[in-house]
Structure formats: structure tokens, C-alpha cells
């Protein structure tokens, strides 16, 4: 917005503020890294994210979309709704079918929940405010299996399980907080269904027609239709992943080991870790961290949990890590699981882009709650073990 003086006249046009922000941002990066290195790093990071992250996420979306459509077609979703409604309702304020989304994201990654959400029959169980909170719910379990298995491979077995419990607590906090934010902004979403009756009727007609076909044809059609929807989701997340992840990583990672910049992917100015080190006493009090370097894990997990896991062997080699840190890393790594790089794209694909700031705020708080819960649960475990 433009600034106004006492007479109501503009002091500076709106475009000037945009220009100042751009000049300051890229001027800072160019001064630290060198302009050619900065440009090369941005382009190469985005290119590597496209090839090794986006297409990986797209493959997850295709597979989980196919599985989800098969589960819907053959009645597993309806069965889960009846069986788990008493559990999911009081804890998460979500229908029982949501548990399928937790399983999908736990076995794969965050966008798997969107492949399910795009199925009208799955979405028909939700009110709008519940449907929107699916992004937060699914993200809290993203890449959970990978995180736990990786931690176990480093020789820690109990701590990751405590971290899993912490992630569940963070998920409850994030999901319910997001629902509260949505209802405060849009009270009418409390009664509006996520899917219109007309869309449900169309799906039921298609379902009746499908039931007349052989089991093999129904299986084939559901897999192909679900996979096709996964491709659409994978394409829709490209802008969010490339733009947000590149920004987060260039402010998180540092130069090469010799302190120089060469313009390769995943180099940066380490601004976020530098800021975090200024308040490392807060992280020690909240999470039980005894070394400021450990702050790099949660900061990196904001953009990509896979990248944060790569820090663990180095932490172990330097003797910075203990069971408490592993429990906290598991909780915050699962709960956040790179949500800054996927939340925008996921909400955009659901059609609620304007609610992205609320979702990010709720999930950021949920991740902190998960980490604090894991820290204190591990502390209690050490007292009784």
C-alpha cells in the first residue's frame, strides 16, 4: 500500500516499496555470495528441486491417488469411517476416513493427502472447515516412516517412538488450531459441506454404473483415474515447491567447506541459523538442546525434512546429539516435514490459497508443541527407565 501524508497525498508510490524490498533482498544475497554465484545457485537449486523433489512428490501423488481411489471404490473408506469415527472425532474433530490420509502421508509424503482430498466421495464426509484442515493433519505425518527408520538406522530406537507420540500431539494442536482460524474467518464453513450435493449425486451415479462392471475393470479404472488426479496435483505443487523451498534453502544453508561460493545448488547465506543462534538459550529451554548447532535441524525441516535428516550423521560425529535430540528431531521433523515448501501448493490445489498464512501459522505452532512434548516425554522416560 502507498504511504500518505497529512494532506492525504502519496509520499511514495506502491511500486517503490516493492523495488526497495527486491533491491535489499538480492543486494544482500549478491553482496555475500557474489551476483553470478547467487544467480547460479538460485537456478540450480530450483532445477534440482524440480528433478529430485517435485517429480518424486508427483510419483507419490500418482501412487497414493491410485491407491486412494481403489480404497474408495471397494468400500474401505466407508469401513474406516464407521470404525474410527469414535476415535477421530473427539481427538481431531475429523471424520474417521481421515485416518486413511494419515497412513498415506506416513508412508509417503505430505501431498498424498491431497490426492485423497480430490476424490469427491472421500471429501463428502467433511464440512468445509474440516476439509481445509486436512492440509495440516496430513502434513503432521508426512514422511514419518522414513524419519523413524532413518533414526533407528543411527542406533536410536526408543527416542523416535517418543518423537512419534510428540508428532501426534502436535498434529492435534495444528489441526484444531487451523479449524479455529477457519471458523473465525468464515463461520459459514461450519455447516457447509466440502462437496456439493450435485457433485455427490454425480459420483453416486458413476459408482452405480461402475458396480455393473467386472471387478477387474473397476480396479483398472479406479487406479488410472486416481493416478491421473495425482498427476494434476503434482503439477499444481510445482510453483510452491520451487519458489518457497529455494528461498528457505538459500537462507538456511551455507557456503562450501572452505567458506567460498561456487554457484552450485544448495549454497546460501546461513541467515536463519545465524538468527537462531542469537536466541539459542530459548531452544535449550524448550527442546533441551545443549549445542546451538542442533538448531539447524528444525530450521531445515521447515523447508525439507529429507535435507534435515542429512545433518544427523554429522551431528553424531561431532558428539552434539543425544536421545533427547533424536526424540525432538523426530517429532518436529515429522510434524513440520518441510511444510513451508508444500503448504502453499497444497492449499492452492484445494482451492483455498487465501488461507495459506493461517495454515502456516497453525502448523508452525503445532511443530513447536510437538517438539516440546517430545522433550518432556523423553525427560520423563529417562526418570522411570
Model features per residue range: what roles?
Residues 1-11, 46, 75-84, 101-118, ...:
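Hydrophobic alpha-helical transmembrane segments
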Residues 1-13, 181-228:
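Intrinsically disordered, low-complexity non-transmembrane regions of multi-pass membrane transporters
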Residues 17-30, 61-68, 146, 164-180, ...:
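Hydrophobic core segments of alpha-helical transmembrane domains in multi-pass membrane transport
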Residues 67-99, 118-123, 283:
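Membrane-embedded helical hairpins/re-entrant loop segments and their flanking transmembrane helices
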Residues 112-177, 305-385:
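C-terminal transmembrane helix pair
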Amino acid at each position: 500500500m502507498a504511504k500518505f501524508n497529512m494532506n492525504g497525498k502519496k509520499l511514495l508510490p506502491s511500486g517503490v516499496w516493492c523495488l526497495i524490498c527486491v533491491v535489499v533482498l538480492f543486494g544482500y544475497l549478491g553482496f555475500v555470495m557474489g551476483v553470478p554465484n547467487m544467480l547460479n545457485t538460485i537456478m540450480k537449486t530450483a532445477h534440482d528441486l524440480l528433478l529430485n523433489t517435485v517429480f518424486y512428490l508427483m510419483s507419490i501423488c500418482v501412487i497414493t491417488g491410485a491407491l486412494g481411489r481403489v480404497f474408495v471404490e471397494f468400500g474401505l473408506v466407508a469401513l474406516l469411517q464407521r470404525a474410527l469415527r469414535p476415535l477421530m472425532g473427539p481427538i481431531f474433530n475429523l471424520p474417521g476416513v481421515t485416518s486413511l490420509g494419515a497412513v498415506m502421508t506416513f508412508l509417503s509424503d505430505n501431498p498424498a493427502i491431497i490426492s485423497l482430498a480430490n476424490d469427491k466421495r472421500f471429501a463428502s464426509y467433511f464440512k468445509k472447515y474440516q476439509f481445509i484442515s486436512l492440509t495440516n493433519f496430513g502434513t503432521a505425518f508426512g514422511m514419518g516412516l522414513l524419519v523413524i527408520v532413518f533414526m533407528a538406522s543411527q542406533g536410536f530406537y526408543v527416542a523416535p517412538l517418543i518423537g512419534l507420540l510428540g508428532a501426534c500431539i502436535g498434529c492435534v494442536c495444528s489441526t484444531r488450531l487451523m479449524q479455529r482460524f477457519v471458523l473465525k474467518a468464515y463461520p459459514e464453513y461450519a455447516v457447509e459441506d466440502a462437496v456439493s450435493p450435485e457433485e455427490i449425486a454425480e459420483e453416486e451415479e458413476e459408482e452405480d454404473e461402475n458396480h455393473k462392471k467386472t471387478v477387474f475393470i473397476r480396479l483398472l479404472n479406479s487406479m488410472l483415474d486416481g493416478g491421473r488426479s495425482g498427476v494434476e496435483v503434482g503439477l499444481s505443487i510445482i510453483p510452491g515447491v520451487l519458489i518457497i523451498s529455494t528461498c528457505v534453502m538459500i537462507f538456511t544453508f551455507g557456503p562450501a567447506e572452505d567458506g567460498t561460493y561456487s554457484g552450485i545448488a544448495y549454497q546460501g547465506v546461513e541467515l536463519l541459523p545465524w538468527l537462531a543462534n542469537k536466541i539459542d538459550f530459548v531452544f535449550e529451554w524448550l527442546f533441551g538442546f545443549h549445542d546451538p548447532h542442533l538448531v539447524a535441524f528444525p530450521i531445515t525441516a521447515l523447508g525439507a525434512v529429507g535435507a534435515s535428516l542429512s545433518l544427523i550423521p554429522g551431528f553424531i560425529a561431532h558428539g552434539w546429539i543425544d536421545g533427547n535430540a533424536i526424540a525432538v528431531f523426530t517429532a518436529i521433523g515429522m510434524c513440520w516435514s518441510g511444510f513451508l515448501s508444500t503448504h502453499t501448493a497444497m492449499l492452492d490445489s484445494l482451492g483455498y490459497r487465501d488461507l495459506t498464512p493461517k495454515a502456516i501459522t497453525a502448523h508452525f505452532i503445532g511443530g513447536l508443541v510437538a517438539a516440546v512434548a517430545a522433550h518432556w516425554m523423553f525427560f520423563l522416560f529417562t526418570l522411570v527407565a
